[in-house]
Amino acid sequence: MRASLLAFSLAAAVAGGQQAGTLTAKRHPSLTWQKCTRGGCPTLNTTMVLDANWRWTHATSGSTKCYTGNKWQATLCPDGKSCAANCALDGADYTGTYGITGSGWSLTLQFVTDNVGARAYLMADDTQYQMLELLNQELWFDVDMSNIPCGLNGALYLSAMDADGGMRKYPTNKAGAKYATGYCDAQCPRDLKYINGIANVEGWTPSTNDANGIGDHGSCCSEMDIWEANKVSTAFTPHPCTTIEQHMCEGDSCGGTYSDDRYGVLCDADGCDFNSYRMGNTTFYGEGKTVDTSSKFTVVTQFIKDSAGDLAEIKAFYVQNGKVIENSQSNVDGVSGNSITQSFCKSQKTAFGDIDDFNKKGGLKQMGKALAQAMVLVMSIWDDHAANMLWLDSTYPVPKVPGAYRGSGPTTSGVPAEVDANAPNSKVAFSNIKFGHLGISPFSGGSSGTPPSNPSSSASPTSSTAKPSSTSTASNPSGTGAAHWAQCGGIGFSGPTTCPEPYTCAKDHDIYSQCV
């Protein structure tokens, strides 16, 4: 992410801790999702967990806060190790305090409740994050961006966090994934209250415009931004790191948002982004545009490897109102294509005069290693105290330079105090999350790993009627109707529409129903 997610106001219950508290009940919101294979898409009923930095932390002996405003409590936290021993991280009122609501297949994140913003992770069980291995796979989900204005970011992305939140590696971390510890990303955020089982007390400098601050240390790891967006602009961006998994950095060597040298030793903070507006198509994404953000749509992202097994291409396309919409083509001189490849990234950096830290940190090949190794799924809603989200939806930097036009938002937009006051009811809803091998989604045209009309072959943004294909190899025991897991309906479908007992034809989208 361009700026660390925690660079914004946290109005209540903010701090970190590494002991496990018991004063507030721990009830994670539920989320149903699917992992698909050629044999079908079994349903997984799991939960989401709120990041540790948002939680109330208090003395293990009582309810005295370890962190108030944007300062550590001096008696409890004279140094990092003492603070970790003295402070407990507690449960959360997900809906009332943090605006996180899970309902079946959907998770909604509201921007302002008693708190401002939120970040949550998909769980495998009560003590482990769900780890997704997405190299040569595709992931798709529905999203409603209609209530996310300019200046906000409703994001879904991957982080190479430890599955247990760092408990095994760092014995002083007693809270672990159950309390959502161990966050990291390619910005190497230094505003995290706890890193590697100790408090980030040393060198802590309180922020001048929010309830955070920065310490001497940051937490780095590879990051894949699948979806960063509001109803004005969107971008998808790989961020490789030379060391894939979570690791701690120190001072300006961290790079990223909070360091004097943005281009640190470990991670590519800028990444290689595909933002349709930035790439010259100003009519592709937004309210009333080709991808119309006034209503819900599906995002499909494919991570395609080459014959050597390395990540070679990241493709994205969309589905709305029964149509597959290919990603827009670049209209920038010297940059071609509508997907992220190594050549696209090199050409883009040259055309815009950007520092090519992406290639220096290993490029797509290094990003592919992280995807193969498995990453944690993250969902968030946030505003940006570092750059007012201009890097996503406005002109950035100012004055104008090549590649600075990123969205139609005014350069005066995104000021957190104004966004908080004027758009408190903003929310993003992610739903119907699924992943599996290339071609498994009903929108991607079978095993080829591309949508029915190849995005790379189109000279301009187009849309076409979807051609869903059955991925089932199951047989139909009764000899009539569709087989178990096979397609049984959808726009343009002419096959059997009944299912053998005890299965029923369940609608997944307007263009696809399946015997389940």
UniProtKB/Swiss-Prot annotation:
Annotated active site: 223 (nucleophile), 228 (proton donor)
PROSITE patterns: CBM1_1, CBM1_2
Catalytic activity: Hydrolysis of (1->4)-beta-D-glucosidic linkages in cellulose and cellotetraose, releasing cellobiose from the non-reducing ends of the chains
Record: glycosylation sites: 45, 281
Catalytic class of the enzyme: hydrolase
Biased amino acid composition, Low complexity: 449-481
Keyword Zinc-finger: no
SS bond partners: 488-505, 499-515
CBM1 domain mapped to chain residues: 480-516
Keywords: Carbohydrate metabolism, Cellulose degradation, Disulfide bond, Glycoprotein, Glycosidase, Hydrolase, Polysaccharide degradation, Secreted, Signal
Molecular function per GO: cellulose 1,4-beta-cellobiosidase activity; cellulose binding
UniProt subcellular location: Secreted
Signal peptide segment: 1-17
Keyword DNA damage: no
Protein's GO biological process: cellulose catabolic process
Record PANTHER family: 1,4-BETA-D-GLUCAN CELLOBIOHYDROLASE B (PTHR33753), GLYCOSIDE HYDROLASE FAMILY 7 PROTEIN (PTHR33753:SF2)
Family from the record: Belongs to the glycosyl hydrolase 7 (cellulase C) family.
Name by which UniProt lists this protein: Exoglucanase 1
Organism: Neurospora crassa (strain ATCC 24698 / 74-OR23-1A / CBS 708.71 / DSM 1257 / FGSC 987)
